[in-house]
């Protein structure tokens, strides 16, 4: 058995999101097909169709967009039949050259939040773990920065936590990433390779993490879409760690922050602090306020 870490990123375009977040969801390979089957069944029962048939997907930026929260609460909860019919009317409106009516918007909003809730519940069901590296948006590199071909400090901490998890379970791990802009992906792959092959810490972690990531398109992979949901929710609504002071979307925080806390990897580890051993909590979601290395 091995563990697959499905990864995505949020905020690296430096536009509307408050932080830069990279990370994802780890799940045992033996549970992968089971959770995918459950996702497909849930999608059809909640929306009444496959979203891919209408060229859309359940990424976090879509399921949890502000408008869908607004639509969902504008009327009482719908029963399953009414919701599915409303969703279909909503999705086919542009094909039929008509405007959706109020109840169609309500149905689509309620279905979106119900799907997000269901996906998080499935992560609990299959004992998935969340790992994420958070850093300030738009941090500038120091002048004459020498380590652009190596991982940033926040990404090193992400690898450290995934490696600890794998070592604890005595299993190896694969990274499967959402394919984005080609040059951006090539750079991150090069940084990973240098980290795992040229640094002592990376070489040690390569005993557990396969150093070569795989890139796939999110619109054809359910698990990368779930990773996107988790990373988006962390960026917009997770403020549990010291230093996370940027504006928060309260509707996401109130609905999912405790869920994200519970799903993140956690380990009690012994570290040498000021010359003495001390037990510390290691969490899968980690904020780094200064991500650029000063030395290798």
Please tell me what each predicted stretch does.
Residues 1-296:
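Phosphate-ester processing/binding pockets and catalytic centers
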């Amino acid at each position: 058995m091995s563990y697959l870490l499905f990864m995505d990123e949020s905020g690296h375009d430096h536009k509307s999101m408050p932080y830069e977040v990279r990370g994802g969801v780890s799940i045992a390979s033996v549970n992968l097909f089971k959770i995918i089957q459950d996702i497909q069944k849930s999608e059809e029962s909640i929306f009444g169709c496959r979203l891919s048939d209408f060229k859309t997907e359940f990424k976090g930026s879509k399921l949890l967009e502000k408008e869908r929260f607004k639509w969902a609460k504008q009327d009482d909860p719908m029963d399953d039949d009414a919701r599915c019919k409303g969703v279909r009317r909503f999705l086919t409106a542009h094909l039929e050259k008509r405007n959706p009516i109020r109840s169609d918007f309500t149905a689509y909003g309620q279905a979106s939040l119900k799907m997000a809730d269901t996906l998080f519940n499935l992560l609990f069901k299959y004992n998935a773990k969340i790992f994420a590296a958070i850093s300030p948006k738009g941090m500038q590199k120091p002048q004459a920065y020498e380590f652009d071909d190596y991982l940033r400090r926040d990404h090193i901490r992400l690898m450290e936590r995934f490696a600890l998890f794998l070592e604890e379970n005595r299993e190896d791990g694969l990274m499967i990433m959402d394919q984005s802009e080609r040059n951006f992906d090539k750079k991150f792959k090069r940084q990973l390779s240098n980290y795992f092959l040229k640094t002592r810490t990376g070489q040690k972690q390569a005993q557990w993490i396969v150093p070569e990531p795989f890139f796939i398109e999110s619109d054809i992979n359910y698990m990368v879409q779930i990773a996107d949901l988790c990373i988006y929710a962390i960026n917009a609504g997770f403020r549990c760690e010291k230093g996370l002071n940027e504006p928060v979307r309260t509707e996401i925080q109130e609905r999912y922050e405790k869920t994200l806390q519970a799903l993140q990897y956690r380990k009690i580890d012994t570290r040498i602090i000021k010359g003495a051993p001390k037990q510390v909590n290691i969490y899968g979601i980690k904020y780094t306020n200064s991500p650029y290395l000063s030395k290798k």
